[in-house]
From Swiss-Prot:
GO biological processes: cysteine biosynthetic process; cysteine biosynthetic process via cystathionine; positive regulation of hydrogen sulfide biosynthetic process; transsulfuration
Organism name: Saccharomyces cerevisiae (strain ATCC 204508 / S288c) (Baker's yeast)
Cell compartments where the protein resides: Cytoplasm
One Pfam family linked to the record: Cys_Met_Meta_PP
Domain of life: Eukaryota
Positions carrying Phosphoserine: S362
Name of protein: Cystathionine gamma-lyase
Primary location group: cytoplasm
CDD domains according to UniProt: CGS_like
Catalytic activity, EC: 4.4.1.1
Length: 394
């Protein structure tokens, strides 16, 4: 079946990347073969030679992700971190990068512990729009943003960042990368606002079932795609056919899962924001009080805030730990974006490797709790939050 330009997101989610099977199977088979027959030397029968280079299941997933991000090209990797590593590996030695300070701990670790050892220097800022013109240098090759950020849910105007890069005298060779993991392609499409590459830890919302580790990227820049595709094959950090198949299956219900999680998260965030007795502050893009709500209205489908919330609890680190250990439906675990609700304390978990001073400068305090709202009943989740707050603050 050929998709039409008028087809909506749900239709694309179900049918993009659809396979053609000689047996007529409705759901694509899993192609586990590592190698493919050739009719004569260097003359493959089909389009595949060796599964590290390409595999039917991976290709179908890549095409599907590209379609949902309004992109021409997609690539899949063995993890979100492998996606990040491959992009940074594409930069010339001696390059400079700019990143928001409030970034996923694993990304911060790669910038500071790996990329710098290979000749890529990174400048971090907590005020990107104001600082970017001064931070871009002659050797700057990349700007990296998350929006919303992990875990404080700051929202960045992607178009403004893209415009700043274009206007800068040294901006012509700078690529803008946006990590869209927290929202998924259902809520936002960064390429529409000037990003050069959009990346996801597909482990999270795209797969959505907490049973696959996988990363993806999408782009409309052909030379950039060809360079990254070369590195994908050369480095070999690719997902297995089964993981690609599982992720593609999860993607088909993305719109249903993400919308439900976002609707529940909005109600939970409103409750937390009203609880002045137990809660210091709430970070959630769907709240009209969010400092960048005007950007949310522009960049997010239906002004949805997504399924991620963070909040500071009264009582400090001890209260945060007690709250995280007192929930019934929210499982204390790292990761996010699955059908089940999760929570964590970033200061000692996902962001524990970031120095305290840098962490707190980005708003990640010891009393911060991050929750990933799943698709359980909204009222049940609210009751769980209420009882855990009571236990933690009394």
């Amino acid at each position: 079946m050929t998709l039409q330009e008028s087809d909506k997101f749900a239709t694309k989610a179900i049918h993009a990347g659809e396979h053609v099977d000689v047996h007529g199977s409705v759901i694509e088979p899993i192609s586990l073969s590592t190698t493919f027959k050739q009719s004569s030397p260097a003359n493959p029968i089909g389009t595949y030679e060796y599964s590290r280079s390409q595999n039917p299941n991976r290709e179908n997933l890549e095409r599907a992700v590209a379609a949902l991000e309004n992109a021409q090209y997609g690539l899949a990797f063995s993890s979100g971190s492998a996606t990040t590593a491959t992009i940074l590996q594409s930069l010339p030695q001696g390059s400079h990068a700019v990143s928001i300070g409030d970034v996923y701990g694993g990304t911060h670790r790669y910038f500071t512990k790996v990329a710098n050892a290979h000749g890529v220097e990174t400048s971090f800022t907590n005020d990107l729009l104001n600082d970017l013109p001064q931070l871009i240098k002659e050797n700057t090759k990349l700007v990296w943003i998350e929006t919303p950020t992990n875990p404080t849910l700051k929202v960045t105007d992607i178009q403004k960042v893209a415009d700043l890069i274009k206007k800068h005298a040294a901006g012509q060779d700078v690529i803008l990368v946006v990590d869209n993991t927290f929202l998924s392609p259902y809520i936002s499409n960064p390429l529409n606002f000037g990003a050069d590459i959009v990346v996801h830890s597909a482990t999270k919302y795209i797969n959505g079932h907490s049973d696959v580790v996988l990363g993806v990227l999408a782009t409309n820049n052909k030379p950039l795609y060809e360079r990254l595709q070369f590195l994908q094959n050369a480095i070999g950090a690719i997902p297995s056919p089964f993981d690609a198949w599982l992720t593609h299956r999860g993607l088909k219900t993305l719109h249903l899962r993400v919308r439900q999680a976002a609707l529940s998260a909005n109600k939970i965030a409103e409750f937390l924001a009203a609880d002045k007795e137990n809660v210091v502050a709430v970070n959630y893009p769907g709240l009209k009080t969010h400092p960048n709500y005007d950007v949310v209205l522009k960049q997010h489908r239906d002004a949805l805030g997504g399924g991620m919330i963070s909040f500071r609890i009264k009582g400090g680190a001890e209260a945060a730990s007690k709250f995280a250990s007192s929930t019934r439906l929210f499982t204390l675990a790292e990761s996010l974006g699955g059908i089940e609700s999760l929570l964590e304390v970033p200061a000692v978990m996902t962001h524990g490797g970031i120095p305290k001073e840098a962490r707190e400068a980005s708003g990640v305090f010891d009393d911060l709790v991050r929750i990933s709202v799943g698709i359980e009943d909204t009222d049940d989740l609210l009751e769980d939050i209420k009882q855990a707050l009571k236990q933690a603050t009394n």
